[in-house]
UniProtKB/Swiss-Prot annotation:
This is Gene 5 protein. The gene is 5. Residues 1-26 are annotated as: Disordered. Residues 8-19 have a biased composition (Basic and acidic residues). It comes from Mycobacterium phage L5.
Amino acid sequence: MGTRGPIGKRDEERVRRNTPDSPTDTIQMPGLVTIPEMGDLSHDGRTHQLVKDMYESIKQSAAVKYYEPTDWQMARLALYTLNQELIAAENNGKPVGAMKLTAINQMLSALLLTEGDRRRVRLEVERAPADPTGGKVVDVTDVLKQRLAKASGGS
């Protein structure tokens, strides 16, 4: 995990006059990591909908670009534990215990699932807005001309 303390500023907000104490070690590995299916995380024959939704959202997260197979197994373990607690809480009519929820939250935090977790390790995600025109500027008169030509039997 990253450093302790308050969440650091975003890079564009930071004024840096010094360099980091130690450079980052990089290990090259061949091949891509395939995203595994969620598998059976059920407890008492049930899988809570929140757990299913969480796994799908993890698969769609930009941070999974950095996941290794062990990270995926940690995600599955954390979600299995969360599922056990959610199902047990439903069956008992009691909320999930604070200590258990804290432990599960720490497991999930190590997976960089929230903005704060990512910023602690200096990882920022910027999503590009969906652009229906593919980034092209379209003149309305050209669009109307094309539609008129199509309607009148032209090409």
